Amino acid sequence: MSDAVDKMLAGMAANRQTMNRQLAKIDEIMERSNNTLLHIESNSKAFSQNVALSETQKMYNLRPEAEMTLSKILENFKLLMSSSDQREETYSALEGCLAYRHRVEHLGSSVRKLVALYDTVGQMKNSQEEQYASEDSP
């Protein structure tokens, strides 16, 4: 009987450690995505103020590093979700599952916003390139 209890406690401890690692990874991804969004937002505000001063200046400026950061965030999220789906089945504490679900929904929402932002920035970049190409052609 005590062996079964010990095994159950060991399993719960392992699940807790796994969950703590997942939380740390989610926090890291959220921090990076928030920093990226803040950077993009500050650039957007700076450019919107300067557009009135100079029409020849680019409206959107996205550095390749920012684009790579967004891609890495999305890749890490996919890896995290695929690895956590396997472990979620063995975890049975209701409160832990509900808290985990809430965090995943929040992260999923943030990722959807990042995907939309990435697509929008890509469209703006293509539009800007087309505009420059049409200005360069005689």
Curated annotation (Swiss-Prot):
Gene disruption: observed consequences: Viable but females are sterile. Mutant embryos show increased mitotic spindle length during metaphase and reduced mitotic spindle density.
Any one GO BP annotation for this protein: mitotic spindle-templated microtubule nucleation
UniProt keyword terms in alphabetical order: Cell cycle, Cell division, Cytoplasm, Cytoskeleton, Microtubule, Mitosis
GO cellular component labels: cytoplasm; HAUS complex; microtubule; spindle
The keyword Cell cycle belongs to this UniProt entry's keyword annotation: yes
Cellular location(s): Cytoplasm, Cytoskeleton, Spindle
SUBUNIT field: Component of the augmin complex composed of dgt2, dgt3, dgt4, dgt5, dgt6, msd1, msd5 and wac. The complex interacts directly or indirectly with microtubules and is required for centrosome-independent generation of spindle microtubules.
Protein name: Augmin complex subunit msd1
Species of provenance: Drosophila melanogaster (Fruit fly)
Chain's gene name: msd1
